[in-house]
Amino acid sequence: MPMFSRFRYIVFTVALLSGPVCAGPRADLSAFTRGLKTLQGHFSQEIIDTQGRVKERSNGTVALSLPNLLRWECDAPYKQLVVADGKRVWLFDPDLNQASVRLQGNEERNSPLIALIDPIQLDLKYDVSEEVAMRDGLRWLSLRPRVGIEASFQSASFGFAQTQLARMELVDNLGQRTVIVFSGWQRNPVFAVDTFRFTPGKNVDVIGDR
């Protein structure tokens, strides 16, 4: 899978959430993100094709900081790194010694993870619903892009366990499903100044416009 496709679900713009509180997973979402400025945790991810076969597994760490900074680092089965520095998105594959770079744009603004960061845009861009029944022991909030919104997914769902975001599931426009399980969240940690910076080495092959 190309590097850009590999990470298109996880690169997003970050902003503060202060949405209305109501019963159910929407309340869980509000509780999870209230007062959020920085966030760090672990993830494991599976990409599943339309036949139900697991195409890819990975795990690693994710860090974000307001207003629009992201670091998504895969540790296994191979190392890869995504850094959104506020202006550009860098994707680095150390095995290939190759980095791809592009401007942050619509893909980030229309990411399903906007649910974590901007409730006004959430309701403007998506039809939001709460699943009535619990699934896998989690309470679920579901999103579908409204007509006219350019998005790389058909639907997205967030699973909460006691106000903690535990899982995200996405179905892309080809019917492929991505399942991301989160754990070990740390709220508002202090990051090193270079956490959200990427500087390619002299011998790194850079593809894209710097």
Swiss-Prot record:
GO terms for biological process: lipoprotein localization to outer membrane; lipoprotein transport. Pfam families: LolA. GO terms for cellular component: outer membrane-bounded periplasmic space. InterPro entries: LolA/LolB/LppX, OM_lipoprot_carrier_LolA-like, OM_lipoprot_carrier_LolA_Pbac. Residues 1-23 form the signal peptide. It is found in: Periplasm. Keywords: Chaperone, Periplasm, Protein transport, Signal, Transport. Belongs to the LolA family. Monomer. Participates in the translocation of lipoproteins from the inner membrane to the outer membrane. Only forms a complex with a lipoprotein if the residue after the N-terminal Cys is not an aspartate (The Asp acts as a targeting signal to indicate that the lipoprotein should stay in the inner membrane). This is Outer-membrane lipoprotein carrier protein. It comes from Xylella fastidiosa (strain 9a5c). The lineage of its organism: Bacteria, Pseudomonadati, Pseudomonadota, Gammaproteobacteria, Lysobacterales. The gene is lolA.
